[in-house]
Amino acid sequence: MKRLALLGALLVSAMAAPSAIAGPQLGGSMPDKPIDNLTMIYATDPALQCYNTAREGADLKFGLEHCNTAVLDPMMNYRAETFVNRGIIRYDLGDHSGALNDFNNALEYNPALGDAYLNQALVLVAEKRPSEAMAAVNQGIALGATNLQVAYYSRAMIADDAGQYAQAYRDYRQALKIKPDYAPAQRQLERFKVVPKGTATQ
């Protein structure tokens, strides 16, 4: 499980559409200049604050409070994405069980949310449940997770750790095909040597 320990940093935040985080009309889009001679106002919508914390990893407890507020708001759209973001924050706080619950809740609201499956897989890896993690990654890939290079890299790491080197190699290459400058996959591929079938290796 040594290589799999690296996967925790790959959690993928889910951005709600602008209509889900409308916020105040003035400054809600974080303008470059003050509007109508007013002091610049930044969006304080709880769902947006939740997303920003999940993405940036700063002030986790503050972000968690905003996530809690957002998911309790009966008028909020894109609840599934907010559960994903809260799950990431909970994972970063060391609450693996809470993170899994949030990713499961996200999938109840939106069963087609590939990012929820991908994040679920990374928590399952941390919990040393690689078979379940592999199934979740596969589902995330099938549903078109936002960052497919992360999905293929994650699947490669799981296969690599299980000694399934051919599959790992293919998935590292697929991650690079999707994002040619993806450094984690580049580093892992440096470990491989490809030789013709039947060739003796030293």
PLM-predicted stretches and their roles:
Residues D92, A126-E127, D161-A162, Q188-G198:
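Register position in tetratricopeptide repeats
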Residues I21-L72:
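N-terminal leader/linker segments that initiate helical-solenoid repeat arrays
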